[in-house]
Curated annotation (Swiss-Prot):
Subunit structure as annotated in this protein's UniProt entry: A double ring-shaped homohexamer of HslV is capped on each side by a ring-shaped HslU homohexamer. The assembly of the HslU/HslV complex is dependent on binding of ATP.
Primary role: ATPase subunit of a proteasome-like degradation complex; this subunit has chaperone activity. The binding of ATP and its subsequent hydrolysis by HslU are essential for unfolding of protein substrates subsequently hydrolyzed by HslV. HslU recognizes the N-terminal part of its protein substrates and unfolds these before they are guided to HslV for hydrolysis.
Pfam family, one: AAA_2
Localisation: Cytoplasm
Keyword ATP-binding on entry: yes
GO terms, biological process: protein unfolding; proteolysis involved in protein catabolic process
NCBIfam families named in the record: hslU, PRK05201.1
Binding locations of ATP: 26, 68-73, 271, 337, 409
Main location: cytoplasm
Species per Swiss-Prot/TrEMBL record: Xylella fastidiosa (strain M23)
Descriptive protein name: ATP-dependent protease ATPase subunit HslU
Length: 459
């Protein structure tokens, strides 16, 4: 059975979590600290006596800030650090019960699906060595079928299989050596391979869960079937290992442990929550449905039971982190009950020119490094000077100030436009070295920046 410690929350300290986030995200220290503390509190809670543990509720977080400043990126990086079931959803995907669309309980189902998948992968890793041994035996059986004698119509297939003779054992050992040395990789063998019976069922919007259950039902009805296939050994091996690993893991234990992990350590990130907020100066229309989504979210965040195909989960101790730009609305426009369920508020800062310079140079996978590596595949060596980085950051900042502020995403647009010609011609410029300096940037982008009408449509 999977150990209960397999999926306990991350044991990283808040300082270590912030340091890890710093490798990928520039600035926003307040948001990083809040997320790090919340993640550490998951671990702290699990160290308490069970009676007290059930009384400690997670302190949900609301992140507020303009688009492109790192809210979603924090969530994406958090997923890799959490070592717990984690799901990110957009609030705009959901509608009030009774309207066409997904209901908010789908969040709980998605979380359990994620946990079961993660647990299953962990279980398969643990039994992989044994699965590889079984797969090897099946390949050898296909290469050298074992002799069997018929005793009668009612005889069991395993009971009538004879022990291999000394000659057969020697031949089998020889083939095993050849198999392990890779000499037989291209040899074709005939195998009985399990068939996954899948049926595509079209369902109306909002009824995806019913469609999933119907697909599962038809899959179970047709389960256990196999078909003969001729495959090269190198293609057959991964299929057989996967099949044998699936036989070795205990699905019931995986499901039970996954539900436990969701209830105790699950984390849900709800993005774009400001898009389901009713604006104070409007009445009726779509705002009715938006407020309905908030009311549907409320029991989920407060703590309720959600039915999934793996069993019922309680959401009392799931950590919810919500984020939104709140351009046209305010956090106070959320319904009061939901406001109270997000006691920790964090405001993310708009990005300055200095932040853009850091974004272009500091992160592990900075945009400039990405372009350098991409063009290196064509044999082109790309280098950015300091004054080029400064000018790119300045242009991105100016365009954001002049038009809609889309934060760091503006850098993608500016760099793509700057390097468009080079990216197009790079296959014909193998072996060249290209240095991007301030003059190069001005030559390619200067006119666009000067003309507000052009930059509005191109940058």
């Amino acid at each position: 059975m999977p150990s209960k410690t397999d999926f306990t929350s991350s044991t990283m300290t808040p300082r270590e979590i912030v340091q890890e986030l710093d490798r990928h995200i520039v600035g926003q220290q307040a948001a990083k600290r809040s997320v790090a503390i919340a993640l550490r509190n998951r671990w702290r809670r699990m160290q308490l006596p069970e009676e007290l543990r059930n009384e400690v509720m997670p302190k949900n977080i609301l992140m507020i800030g303009p688009t492109g400043v790192g809210k979603t990126e924090i969530a994406r990086r958090l997923a890799t650090l959490a070592n717990a079931p984690f799901v990110k959803v957009e609030a705009t995907r959901f509608t009030e019960v009774g309207y066409v669309g997904k209901d908010v309980e789908q969040i709980g189902r998605d979380l359990v699906d994620t946990a079961v998948k993660m647990y299953r992968e962990q279980a398969k890793v643990r039994v992989r060595t044994q699965a590889e041994e079984y797969a090897e035996e099946r390949i050898l059986d296909a290469l050298l079928p074992r002799r069997s004698v018929g005793i009668g119509f009612d005889a069991d297939a395993d009971a009538i299989r004879q022990e291999p003779s000394a000659h057969e054992s020697e031949t089998r050992a020889k083939f095993r050596r050849m198999l392990r040395s890779g000499e037989l990789e291209e040899r074709e063998i005939e195998l009985d391979v399990a068939v996954n019976v899948s049926m595509d069922i079209m369902t109306p919007p909002g009824m995806e869960e019913m469609g999933q259950q119907l697909r599962q039902m038809f899959s179970n009805i047709g389960g256990g079937k196999s078909q003969k296939r001729k495959l090269a050994i190198k293609a057959a091996r991964p299929l057989l290992i996967e099949e044998e690993a699936a036989k070795l893991v205990n699905e019931d234990e995986i499901r039970a442990a996954a539900i436990e992990a969701c209830e105790q350590n699950g984390i849900v990130f709800i993005d774009e929550i400001d898009k389901v907020v009713k604006r104070g100066d409007t009445v009726g229309g779509g705002d009715v449905s938006r407020e309905g989504v908030q009311r549907d979210l409320l029991p989920l965040v407060e703590g309720s039971n959600v039915s999934t195909k793996y069993g019922t989960i309680r959401t009392n101790h799931i950590l919810f982190i919500a984020s939104g730009a709140f351009h046209l609305t305010k956090p106070s426009d959320l319904i009061p009950e939901l406001q109270g369920r997000f006691p920790i508020r964090v405001e993310l800062d708009a990005l300055s020119k200095a932040d853009f310079i850091r974004i272009l140079t500091e992160p592990k996978a900075a945009l400039t490094k990405q372009y350098q590596e991409l063009l290196k595949t064509e044999g082109v060596s790309l280098d950015f000077t300091e004054d080029a980085i400064d000018r790119i950051a300045e242009i991105a900042y100016l365009v954001n100030e002049r038009q809609e502020n889309i934060g760091a995403r503006r850098l993608h647009t500016v760099l793509e436009r700057l390097l468009e010609t080079l990216s197009y011609e790079s296959p014909d410029r193998d072996g060249e070295s290209v240095t991007v300096d301030a003059d190069y940037v001005n030559a390619h982008l200067g006119e666009l920046v000067k003309d507000p009408d052009l930059s509005r449509y191109i940058l």
